[in-house]
């Protein structure tokens, strides 16, 4: 019988296990057991891109510059401050903030110490934000000073929160009904002599909530391992193709699925980071891109529409920007052609979701596809693209069987991979079906492996890259005493891609008007959720089981033109 080797100094249990494997069992590799941790990304950047700049447009109005070396030092100071406040491993710490250097420090300081960085979308309705903070049981919440009134409104509803930390210095600390802690005071009290703890890579590092399109928002809990692997995948040549030669400006907010992973992927590659803060209008973005010689950006179509409109009116061009990722909602082909033909910027069409960390596919051609006629290339690039390494996808029919990749068959899109959700945070049942995550999207996949989203299995509306719940819109309408029945559907919009149209059956004898009904929404949903228009009808189409036939409604109002005055995020 083979002897069992006893532990000796410096030997880990994993190594002993490898040494003690007997014949007939798998032979494990003998490589270092080093966990994949988010802190390793900022440490790598601080050592190997130490003098590379991080430039931020601050909420206070000025431009802030420092280096990756500075960022890691301050992130460590923040970790020390949080420990002094009593934050422990696994505690959730929220952020209500724009893209800026302090928010980046929170990403690494919170996750690096073993707590969970919970990014919160400030565009949600205050009651939703309060629900999310309470569901996550956040111990502390960081916030940009322009969100002080929002914090004052929700703080009494959030009993778990021990303190609200204003991300500013003492000179700009806002006053309000809530006693605020000062970010800079906390950080400056620490010396930064701190070693990142060696955590389990499966430990949670981040938390994002979905937009609650089918009820209350759901939490998606990312691990250190999933986050680092996603960063590796995002940086690949056939994904975002990031390098130390790039200056990257993420327009997509850091509260929106971790800015599509860029705050992790850019330090991994050592590129320059340019963070735009709250000013996302076309003029502000263009001037910042030009001043900082930005080469790469990422955002939703709505933002790019504003930028292109400004550039046309001002008669200006890009001098350094050469590519941008567009996702969140489908990129209009005309926008893709404008970027490439008029401004020489390559558009990378992408698809993903919160449950995917978020990247799933990106439209990048291989060599053979690049040799096809230009029109054929563009038809591929207008789709949502191919999966990046690490993600697997399939489409299935109503019977659950996998459908062919022929560009014709369409079914429910399902995905799996090391950065795909397994369970929702504090959820009971797993959402997986046979080991796959059902996305709720209906799609086709062509023989080249390019995904195209053709419809949504759930009647949600995506406006400017943000989800709007049709169910919530309908519930408010039905609560009006003059409404007998209501349905909310998506209508095409030239700026926001989609906006809600409310179709209403009035109660007999009710004196109901468009304006009175829309006014009824004030204070009940976020302003940008309020429908753009109301159409009154005698009846709504139903199935034999009494369900609304929204597909028929969408067909009826397919060519409906919404008013030009819209309320959007």
PLM region spans:
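Conserved AMP-binding/adenylation subdomain of ANL enzymes
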Residues: 228-247, 255-295, 310-311, 361
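Conserved beta-loop-beta connector loops within the AMP-binding
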Residues: 386-414, 447-448, 510-514, 549
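Conserved AMP-binding/adenylate-forming core of the ANL superfamily
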Residues: 54-100, 104-108, 125-130, 182-185
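AMP-binding/adenylate-forming catalytic core of the ANL superfamily
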Residues: 124, 130, 141-143, 297, ...
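Structural core segment of the AMP-binding/adenylate-forming
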Residues: 84-85, 112-188, 508-510
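Conserved adenylate-forming
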Residues: 82-87, 190-202, 207-249, 261, ...
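AMP-dependent adenylate-forming
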Residues: 41-67, 172-174
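Gly/Ser/Thr-rich phosphate-binding loop
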Residues: 268, 291-299, 308-379, 392, ...
